[in-house]
Every structure is written in C-alpha cells, then in structure tokens.
Amino acid sequence: MLNIIINAYACSPNMGSEPGMAWDWFINLAKHCELHIITEGEFKEKIETALPTLPQGKNMHFYYNPVSDEIRKMCWNQGDWRFYKYYKQWQWKTYEMAKDIIAKQKIDIIHQLNMIGFREPGYLWKIENKPFVWGPIGGMKQFPEAYLQGSGIKMQVFNKLKNKINIYQIKHDKRVHRALTKADLLISSIPDSYYAIKKYKHLESVIIPETGCFKSELL
C-alpha cells in the first residue's frame, strides 16, 4: 500500500466546494493508500467525528495546522487580499510539518491538493527524492471578453486586467514555475488549465475535475 502525504488547506466531510472536494479525494484514495493529511483546523471536530464511521478511516491520519478565527474570516471573505499573506505563511509551516512527518514515516508520494488556485503552489515541491504530484490545478481560465459587451467600463477594465495578470503570473511567477517543473505529475481541474500549462510551460497534465466521481456513481 502506498503512503501519501497530502497538503490540503481546506477539508470537511460536511461541506461542498474546496473542503468537500478534499474530503472526497481522501475517502476514495484511502481505500487503496495510507494517507498523511495536513490541513487547517477549522473542521477538526467534524473530521474526527466522521473518521470512525468509515471502513477506510484507519488509513487517514490527520495533522492540523490551525490559524486564528480572524484569518479564517479573511479566507471566507473572498476578495480579502490580506488572507494571502497568512496563507503563504501557513504553507511554509505545512512544509516544515511535512518534513517532520517524512522523517518519521515511510512516505512514497507527496501531493499538493488544495487550494486548487495555481498562484499558491505551497512548498512541498522543495522536498527532494519523493515523487511530487500537484493538482487539481485551477484559476487559469480566462474571462471571455465577449461576455463584457454592454457592461460598464469598470467591469471591462477589471476583467481584462485580470486576464492579463493571470497570464503574466502563469508565465513569470518563479515559485509557480518551480513547482510546475518539479512535479512528476500535474493534474488540471478543467481543459483551460490543461491548455494553459501546455501553452505557457510546455508541460503535460492529466484532466481530473475537482468534483470527479466514478462512472459507477453516474449509473
């Protein structure tokens, strides 16, 4: 059985969006692998309550890296740019925790799971001699400018500028570049991410939607 260490800031068994996505990945991976999961502590009680109810729960080992309530409010208040300073600090502490776990546990694979936005790849890619997986990767989709016809000048300027900044960051952000090129496997959340990684970095990735499911679940 493979042993995987996973970085997932957001995780909850009782939510959708990023927290629910991470939980769904974990409960399926844990059927086949031993997981060592570093996550933020907001939903610790819900996680610890859910684990004993799962047959694969014994394969899911959680390590909590909590932040303050104030920082959590910044996270949920989308658009609060102050959060990213603390999120970057959280990622560095997670990197330190991961190194400590790897020193004590037999780890086969490192996985950077969420948040899925490409702008913050964390630091686990810096760990040597372990295969590194990053994804699903999102945030690379360009806003269709055709949708801006008839909108106000403020909306047009905002979205056109956002598109340009996105491309600039994909092409020139040094840490993003290092994480992308270090990865043994890249996972794109949507085709737009796949094509952006291919176009600007000349790298291959596989497309697995963040809300992916088994074919059997569709029947």
Where are these regions (language model features)?
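Soluble, non-transmembrane catalytic domains of enzymes that act on hydrophobic metabolites at membranes
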Residues: 10-15, 20-28, 42-46, 102, ...
